């Protein structure tokens, strides 16, 4: 099956187009970003200079002025569109049960 941005679709759960403020931290750097999409297993974010695949990251998602912090791993780089402009998307796998509950209880109802 072909994914949304032309590559193979390897998703374990459906994507939800949701734009939330997020803070990405890795290798001593902090970046303020917005999500492109979210699933129960991770997020896709835009990043012009993406961290290498395999990089451990900390992602803080802010929804309705409430911040929640999760740890994940960069699993892929892909092409994506952000406001009609082609960009690099960074797929971050977040495999904690807390994150899945967060998505079910906060994201899907937002």
List the model feature ranges, each with a label.
Residues 1-38, 101-110:
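N-terminal helix initiation/capping motif
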Residues 26, 37, 76-78, 94:
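A residue-level detector for short acidic-glycine micro-motifs
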Residues 20-24, 54-68:
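Short conserved beta-strand and strand-loop elements enriched in small hydrophobics
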Residues 27, 49-51, 62-66, 79-80:
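Short polar/acidic secondary-structure junctions
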Residues 33-34, 70-77:
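Short beta-strand-centered aromatic/proline hotspots
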Residues 44-47, 78-94:
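Short, solvent-exposed secondary-structure boundary/capping segments
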Residues 53-55, 100-102:
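Short, conserved charged micro-motifs
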Residues 16, 51-53:
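Short, well-ordered loop/turn sites that connect or cap secondary structure elements
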């Amino acid at each position: 099956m072909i994914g949304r941005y032309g590559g193979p679709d390897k998703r374990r759960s459906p994507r939800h187009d949701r734009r939330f403020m997020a803070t990405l931290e890795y290798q001593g750097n902090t970046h303020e970003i917005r999500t492109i999409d979210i699933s129960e297993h991770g997020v896709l974010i835009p990043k012009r200079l993406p961290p290498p695949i395999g990089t451990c990251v900390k992602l803080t998602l802010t929804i309705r002025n409430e911040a929640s912090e999760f740890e994940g791993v960069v699993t892929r780089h892909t092409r994506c569109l952000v406001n009609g402009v082609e960009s690099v998307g960074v797929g971050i796998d977040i495999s904690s049960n807390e994150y899945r509950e967060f998505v079910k209880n906060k994201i899907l109802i937002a």
